[in-house]
């Protein structure tokens, strides 16, 4: 399954610089003026996972295949975007196609870099973007309510219940509250509405506090304020320096680690973002290990073996028989499949087995 992260923010907060660094690309214009991103830029990035390297040391495959994550650099939003201001609705629709919103927020002072609102204020910036997302959701939900009203009058099955919840959700949005904070968001009707409408304010949000080189090791006042706000709203804050992320491009893993350590940082911005996105979306990885390739596969936590097998090929799910499973720890400890098998650590699991993060799996199937 694919994971897509939309990078949003006001103009000139470091979005495109961050995108370029995270994707090790230079295809997103990065300049000191609003709307330098005219079209949304997309790039696929490997999900870093050191476990793949350890598996490869044992198996010695022809290639290593990481899971992939898509980053989408979305043009800077401004007040009125939901009504077509700035670059408008087209870019709100680009956000709609993503699973996670990475909201880059400027948390540094620099006179030479203009701010579209005239000064640095992270919480104001966050509220501007949030308001535009909510307003766009209100417009879309209102159209759905018109349709549901007609269906309810025609006594279509489930229409009255859906209409009742949709009106309740609209009231919630009209109070300036995100769909993600709606009290009944676990209900089946809510989930169906969100799946159909892909409401923007229902998406998982990660705030990227973009600091300068001096603010990377300790939180400045801007970051502290953003973290306090995020905590109240059940969101995560990742502190990153777009300039430092750019400097990491082209460095080996060892060089990157040394460079980050010298700055008092344990993890790159990319690693933080992916780790947090995985956690927010309830994603895990399992592995397949053979002489042709060692590969990581991304699935939802709680998936049973046949469903997990479907990300390789639908036939694996349709014709599922059994799954041979070795935990990552046992695979490493016993030096591979043969050693794990001799130690009694290879298990045969059936259709009800819930796959765990790090499982090394081989599927038996017949179509």
Give residue spans per PLM region.
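Residue-level signal for pocket-adjacent positions within structured domains
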Residues: 25-33, 40-42, 50, 54, ...
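A ubiquitous short alpha-helical element
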Residues: 59, 129-133, 242
């Amino acid at each position: 399954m694919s994971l897509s992260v939309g990078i949003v923010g006001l103009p000139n907060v470091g979005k495109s610089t961050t995108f370029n660094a995270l994707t090790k690309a230079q295809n997103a214009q990065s300049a000191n003026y609003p709307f330098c991103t005219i079209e949304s830029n997309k790039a696929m990035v490997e999900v870093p996972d050191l476990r793949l390297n350890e598996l490869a040391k044992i198996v010695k495959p022809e290639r290593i295949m990481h899971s992939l994550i898509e980053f989408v650099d979305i043009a800077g939003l401004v007040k009125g975007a939901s009504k077509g201001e700035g670059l408008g609705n087209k870019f709100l629709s680009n956000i709609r196609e993503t699973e996670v919103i990475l909201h880059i927020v400027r948390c540094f002072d620099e006179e030479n870099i203009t701010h579209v609102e005239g000064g640095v204020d992270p919480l104001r910036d966050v509220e501007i973007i949030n308001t535009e997302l909510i307003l766009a959701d209100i417009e879309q939900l209102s159209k759905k309510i018109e349709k549901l009203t007609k269906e309810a009058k025609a006594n279509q099955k489930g229409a009255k219940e859906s209409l009742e919840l949709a009106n309740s959700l609209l009231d919630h949005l009209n109070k300036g509250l995100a769909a993600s904070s709606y009290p009944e968001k676990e209900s089946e009707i809510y989930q169906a509405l969100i799946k159909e409408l892909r409401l923007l304010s229902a998406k998982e949000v990660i705030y990227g506090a973009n600091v300068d080189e001096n603010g990377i090791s300790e939180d400045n006042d801007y970051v502290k304020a953003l973290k306090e706000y995020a905590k109240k709203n059940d969101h995560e804050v990742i502190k990153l320096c777009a300039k430092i992320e750019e400097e990491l491009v082209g460095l080996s893993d060892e060089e990157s680690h040394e460079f980050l350590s010298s700055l008092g940082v344990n993890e790159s911005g990319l690693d933080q973002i992916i780790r947090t996105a995985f956690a927010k979306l309830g994603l895990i990885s399992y592995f397949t290990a053979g002489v042709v390739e060692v590969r990581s596969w991304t699935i939802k936590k709680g998936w049973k073996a046949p469903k997990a097998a479907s990300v390789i090929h639908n036939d694996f799910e349709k014709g599922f028989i059994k799954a041979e499973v070795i935990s990552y720890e046992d695979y490493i400890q016993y030096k591979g499949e043969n050693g794990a098998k001799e130690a009694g650590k290879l298990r045969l699991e059936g259709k009800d087995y819930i796959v765990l993060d790090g499982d090394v799996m081989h599927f038996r199937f017949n179509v």
